[in-house]
Amino acid sequence: MNEPLLLFRGIEKTYAETNILRNVDISLYPGKCILLSGNNGSGKTTLLKIIAGLETPSRAEIELSGKSHSWKSAIRSIRREIIYLHQQPYLLSGTVESNVSYGLRFTHLNRKQLRESVKEALEWAGLADVAKHQAKTLSGGVQQRVAFTRAWILKPKVLLLDEPMANMDIESRQQACDLLKRMKSEGMSIVITSHDMNIFDGLIDSHCSLSDGKLD
């Protein structure tokens, strides 16, 4: 197996003296997808947010290039390489095209390069025919694909998805899985939380379960 992109070790999180996460280790590999399951309140979302740098752990270390660093000192250098997506797409008001282009507006790309990148992304995701549609008027499955594409265009190394297939019909799930498989084939590391691993046709490489704050 390839060297891991990131190793998170000894993750702990305590809320009001309750141990939500207890000494959790997780390794993220390029081109691999982890399914993270567990009951509601087991800490799945908390773990994803700690990996993404959106929530501070009580304790954690990150291993980079064979050296261990505290979470606080290391997360700043890797935060831009990680994208976390909530169960809800949280699209902006405006067209599909403007949603997909949003993150690129804060990069060095000029207008021509931005337009070309957005066009490529929309074609890649099979969204070119709805590019000018108002994003929030589309079905939930299409909105989620827009959110995936908005993430993909920024070329993160790690994509964290919190219950991404909730409330999708079978066809929408298959289309979303197809996009995620393509991301994985390009070397992206993906972590998905879900209660049902049977809906991720051929996508999952490994399965971990959170219970009593520990990862099995």
Question: What do these predicted regions represent?
Answer:
Residues 52:
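Helix-to-loop junction immediately C-terminal to a conserved catalytic motif
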Residues 134-138, 142:
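Conserved ABC ATPase signature
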Residues 112-130:
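Conserved ABC ATPase "signature" region
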Residues 159-162:
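Catalytic Walker B motif of ABC-type/P-loop ATPase nucleotide-binding domains
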